[in-house]
Curated annotation (Swiss-Prot):
Keywords: Cytoplasm, Lipopolysaccharide biosynthesis, Nucleotidyltransferase, Transferase. It catalyses: 3-deoxy-alpha-D-manno-oct-2-ulosonate + CTP = CMP-3-deoxy-beta-D-manno-octulosonate + diphosphate. Pfam families: CTP_transf_3. One of its GO terms (cellular component) is cytosol. This is 3-deoxy-manno-octulosonate cytidylyltransferase. It comes from Porphyromonas gingivalis (strain ATCC BAA-308 / W83). One of its GO terms (molecular function) is 3-deoxy-manno-octulosonate cytidylyltransferase activity. NCBIfam families: kdsB (TIGR00466), PRK05450.1-3 (NF003950), PRK05450.1-5 (NF003952), PRK13368.1 (NF009905). HAMAP family: KdsB. Belongs to the KdsB family.
């Protein structure tokens, strides 16, 4: 276990697509508890960062560490930075684990941390290849941001749209003709860079796509992207939750 890593799980109650999502029941446990259980034991500390008393109480009830943050935070990364400033103990790597990724796996977290074996890595995240038989409807889902990578494995752009556009090819064939990457919402930062990027003003692309990582790219920061072979189920809507619960039952994880 890497003792120089802290995981912070930003969680807010007021989601426009799924209000109260962190406390939604997943077969007897809240979603935030299932996310917390995924990270405990993988890194030395896991801290939930929230601005809501209901979430704070729920985390304390299951024995987790929690810190209250400002309701003015405009993104999960800003909440992560505030939490680290309050409770950090000099860790060298800060993980920002989204509170709607209850199926994140140990191997994925270890992979992300391994990015910092290279001293030039300041920010890292994960991507999964869309399989060749994925329908265009699923590829085109704006809740599953796509990444375009350079030859060195760094992000060129993130988009809710399908990029690149394949001219002259039927959309249902796109995944058979090109490799598309799905972004998995977990980040890792060096603390100095985390503080810098959260002090920057919002960028135009970030505002257009509502993807905070575009701010970092627009201001010249490089994001290293590691490819994972494991799939996850991110939960953005009540319909996603129904699929997640069905998956829990199918895996005997009740």
């Amino acid at each position: 276990m890497n003792t120089e890593v802290i995981a912070i799980i930003p969680a807010r109650f007021a989601s426009s697509r799924f209000p109260g999502k962190p406390l939604a029941d997943m077969l007897g446990k809240s979603m935030i508890q299932r996310v917390h259980e995924r990270i405990v034991g993988v890194v030395p500390r896991a801290v939930v960062a929230t601005d809501d008393e209901r979430i704070r109480q729920a985390v304390e009830d299951f024995g987790g560490e929690v810190v209250m943050t400002s309701p003015e935070c405009s993104s999960g990364t800003e909440r992560c930075r505030e939490a680290f400033d309050k409770v950090g103990r000099g860790e060298k790597i800060v993980l920002n684990l989204q509170g709607d990724e209850p199926f994140i796996q140990k191997e994925q977290i270890d992979l992300l941390i391994s990015a910092f074996d290279k001293p030039e890595t300041d920010i890292a995240t994960l991507a999964e290849v869309f399989s060749s038989d994925v329908s265009f409807e699923r590829l085109n889902n704006p809740n599953s941001p796509k990444i375009v990578l350079d030859h060195g494995g760094y992000a060129l752009y993130f988009s809710r749209s399908v990029i690149p556009y394949l001219r002259g090819v039927q959309p249902d064939s796109w995944c058979r003709r090109h490799t598309y990457y799905k972004h998995i919402g977990i980040y890792a930062f060096r603390p100095t860079v985390l503080r810098k990027i959260t002090s920057l003003p919002q960028s135009t692309a970030e505002q257009a796509e509502s993807l905070e990582q575009l701010r970092w790219l627009e201001y010249g920061y490089r994001i290293r992207v590691l490819q994972t072979q494991q799939s996850t189920i991110g939960i953005d809507t009540p319909e996603d939750m129904e699929k997640a619960i069905a998956y829990l039952r199918s895996q005997g994880m009740e």
